[in-house]
From Swiss-Prot:
GO terms for biological process: symbiont-mediated suppression of host cytoplasmic pattern recognition receptor signaling pathway via inhibition of MDA-5 activity; symbiont-mediated suppression of host JAK-STAT cascade via inhibition of STAT2 activity; symbiont-mediated suppression of host type I interferon-mediated signaling pathway. Disulfide bonds: none annotated. Pfam families: Soyouz_module, zf-Paramyx-P. Residues 65-72 are annotated as: Nuclear localization signal. Interacts with host IFIH1/MDA5 and DHX58/LGP2. Forms with host DDB1, CUL4A, STAT1 and STAT2 the HPIV2 virus V-dependent complex (VDC); this complex targets host STAT2 to proteasomal degradation. The keyword Membrane does not apply. Residues 145-173 are annotated as: Disordered. GO terms for cellular component: host cell nucleus. This is Non-structural protein V.
Length: 225
């Protein structure tokens, strides 16, 4: 059985001094990532043999050509277009805002107004008054679950829909149209005539005949102003 080696105090101090010198040497210089060895590259076993093999494997890599680093191209263009937060032009105090259903340049027709507070109704056609009453009832009950008392001029009434069947309108080859709007405390119903061949739009517009068989004035629109 071989005897264990013994070291004197001077030999131990010399080994410690050499080890500390090696540590100071590597700490005083930058570490090259290509030549440094991680723990994952040294499998368990005879450390001296495996370490030498790993170092020999890393030397060709260090001696190989160094790839140039790619320069990061910084684009000067903004990827997003930022909208200007310009405040809208403020209207003077008490400036009325036009209702889209009641344009300023509306065609000739009849206007029926009903005041919700007083219940006063301006002069208008029978159908306009009925629709104004329906508009008032709808406005007062729009946030409740109560059913309307009367269906006159309601969605169940075919005459309420623009272009609905009507014998008088069929004779005149005109289509009577209505536009209901709520302006303040008033319900406004505007009515006018359009040729039957004209398209149905959401705004109060006057169209001209395109089929050549519609008269310019019918029995319903001859009294419009």
């Amino acid at each position: 059985m071989a005897e264990e080696p013994t070291y004197t105090t001077e030999q131990v101090d010399e080994l410690i001094h050499a080890g500390l010198g090696t540590v100071d040497f590597f700490l005083s210089r930058p570490i090259d990532a290509q030549s440094s060895l991680g723990k994952g590259s040294i499998p368990p076993g005879v450390t001296a043999v495996l370490t030498s093999a790993a170092e020999a494997k890393s030397k060709p890599v260090a001696a190989g050509p160094v790839k140039p680093r790619r320069k990061k191209v910084i684009s000067n263009t903004t990827p997003y277009t930022i909208a200007d937060n310009i405040p809208p032009e403020k209207l003077p105090i008490n400036t009325p805002i036009p209702n889209p259903l009641l344009p300023l340049a509306r065609p000739h027709g009849k206007m029926t107004d009903i005041d919700i507070v007083t219940g006063n109704i301006t002069e208008g056609s029978y159908k306009g008054v009925e629709l104004a009453k329906l508009g008032k009832q709808t406005l007062l009950t729009r946030f409740t679950s109560n059913e309307p008392v009367s269906s006159a001029g309601s969605a169940q009434d075919p005459n309420f829909k623009r272009g609905g069947a009507n014998r008088e309108r069929a004779r005149g080859n005109h289509r009577r149209e209505w536009s209901i709007a709520w302006v303040g405390d008033q319900v406004k119903v505007f009515e006018w005539c359009n040729p039957r061949c004209a398209p149905v739009t959401a705004s109060a517009r006057k169209f001209t005949c395109t089929c050549g068989s519609c008269p310019s004035i019918c029995g319903e629109c001859e009294g419009d102003h």
